[in-house]
Structures are given as structure tokens and as C-alpha cells.
A protein has these predicted regions:
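Active-site metal-binding motif and surrounding structural segment of the metallo-beta-lactamase
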Residues: 50-95
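Conserved beta-strand hairpin/beta-sheet module of binuclear metal-dependent hydrolase folds
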Residues: 3-58, 148-159
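Active-site neighborhood of phospho(di)ester-bond hydrolases with catalytic His/Asp-centered motifs
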Residues: 43-45, 67-75, 94-98, 157-161, ...
């Protein structure tokens, strides 16, 4: 399934993959594409097995030569296992936390020269003219070097594994419709994969100042409206990781 989440003037934010690959049994994932004028940004393209279906979707909206940037939230294979083929097929530069630069060669990536490290404090990534993406640190929230992506035009925050849910679960469609019912789908994951409540609170305080219309995680349903507020409140109070030892 692909769905345009935002479309205004020369700017789009598109969900191009939603938890449907048969190769991803147990860990279904979401992939996103941002288009700004003639520049396209691919977020967390996933493993090699996803390439054919993502390519067919992507070509509905853009051209391979227009993929300007790839942003990787962290080092896991469901995020960047297929990175080599995207670097071979495009001229894009890929961005990932500095922490993971020395590990990526283990994915047999040939074009390491086109991978750029993101500093621990995050950065504003200029795409064209005045348009930029905010790359926001989310360290120790699953990965010790995780990065979120905020698009100030669409007001969509890509949160990587934060807010992730295991599917199929609950009676939702694309967006979380009943957060209280959906909590059982995210509770176990967050208690095990997030390092601590201290890390969660630091992240919540960092992002709650943003104007957010949609939270788009790497796995599971998306959040909008009241569910954005409820997710942040839930995470702020959650005991997880080392809190449970």
C-alpha cells in the first residue's frame, strides 16, 4: 500500500511501504518518501527483499535520478540492509548517525564515500533553497545512535522505532484510532527495546516543542490528532529497559 500523507504545492510526504512484504514476517516495516520540487528523500528503505516493491511504488511519484538523499534512522538490517542497491541505482547521499559509519561496510556497501555521518546533537539538513529537514537525536531509544526526521512543511515527524507497533494488532486501519486499545500492541516492544524512562523523557521534551500533525514510525500504525498527544504522554511515563531490572 502507498498513500500520500501530505500534498501541497510542490511538496509531498508519501508512505510508500506499509508492513506488507512476505519477506518481513514478524517485523513488518514502513518506508517513506519526501518530495520537494524535483528533489526526493527516501527514509529507511529497508532490506534487499523490499527493493522490487518499493521501486515500483517509488516510480509512481519520482525518478531514480531525482532521489537526492537517503536518511537512515539507525543501523538495523530492516533499515539499511538494502542500502547498497539504492546507492548503486541512484546518485543519492545517505545520512546515518556517526556511530554507525564504521559498521556499514559489513553490509557489503561499495559506495561508502557517499555515506555521511550525523553528529550526536543532530543537524538541519538543507535539501534545496530554504527547505531543510531536522535530523533529531533519539539516542538509546532502541538504538544508541538513532535519528528522527522532522519535515517542517508537512509537520510530519518520522520517529524510527519510537511508537512502533507489532502488526497485525488491534482494530485500526492506517492510523491509530483507539490509542488505549493500541497500547497492548506497543507496550511490550517499548519496555524491552527502549533503554530507560530518562532517555524517553529527554526525547519527549525535545520533540514536544515541534508542531506535529503526524507521527510516522518505522513499524505499525501512524499517529495523528489526539493520538500524537497520547503517545507522547504514554512514553513520558513509561518505565522500560533498565528501569525494569
Amino acid at each position: 500500500m502507498d498513500k500520500i500523507l501530505f500534498d501541497e504545492k510542490n511538496h509531498k510526504f508519501i508512505l510508500i511501504g506499509f508492513a506488507e512484504s512476505k519477506d518481513e514476517q514478524g517485523i513488518p516495516s514502513n518506508q517513506y518518501l519526501i518530495q520537494h520540487k524535483n528533489k526526493s528523500i527516501l527514509i529507511d528503505p529497508g532490506g534487499f527483499g523490499l527493493f522490487p516493491i518499493l521501486l515500483s511504488r517509488l516510480l509512481k511519484y519520482t525518478k531514480l535520478q531525482d532521489i537526492h538523499t537517503i536518511v537512515l534512522s539507525h543501523q538495523d538490517p530492516d533499515v539499511c540492509g538494502g542500502l547498497n542497491i539504492w546507492l548503486e541505482m541512484t546518485e543519492a547521499e545517505a545520512y546515518i548517525s556517526n556511530l554507525w559509519l564504521r559498521f556499514l561496510p559489513h553490509y557489503d556497501i561499495k559506495r561508502i564515500d557517499r555515506i555521511i555521518g550525523i553528529p550526536d546533537e543532530g543537524m538541519d539538513l538543507t535539501i534545496e533553497g530554504k527547505f531543510y529537514l531536522k535530523l533529531i537525536p533519539a539516542h538509546f531509544l532502541h538504538s544508541p545512535g538513532q535519528v528522527n526526521v522532522y519535515d517542517p512543511v508537512s509537520k510530519i515527524l518520522f520517529t524510527g522505532d519510537i511508537g512502533a507497533g507489532m502488526l497485525p494488532c488491534s482494530e485500526n486501519n492506517l492510523f491509530v484510532e483507539d490509542f488505549e486499545n493500541y497500547k497492548k500492541c506497543i507496550d511490550g516492544f517499548h519496555k524491552r527495546y527502549m533503554a530507560s524512562n530518562q532517555a524517553l523523557r529527554k526525547w519527549v521534551k525535545n520533540v514536544e516543542s515541534l508542531d506535529i500533525n503526524i507521527i510516522a514510525p518505522k513499524h505499525g500504525y501512524l499517529y495523528k490528532g489526539e493520538s500524537v498527544k497520547k503517545l507522547l504522554e504514554y512514553l513520558y511515563d513509561l518505565k522500560c529497559g533498565i528501569d525494569l531490572l
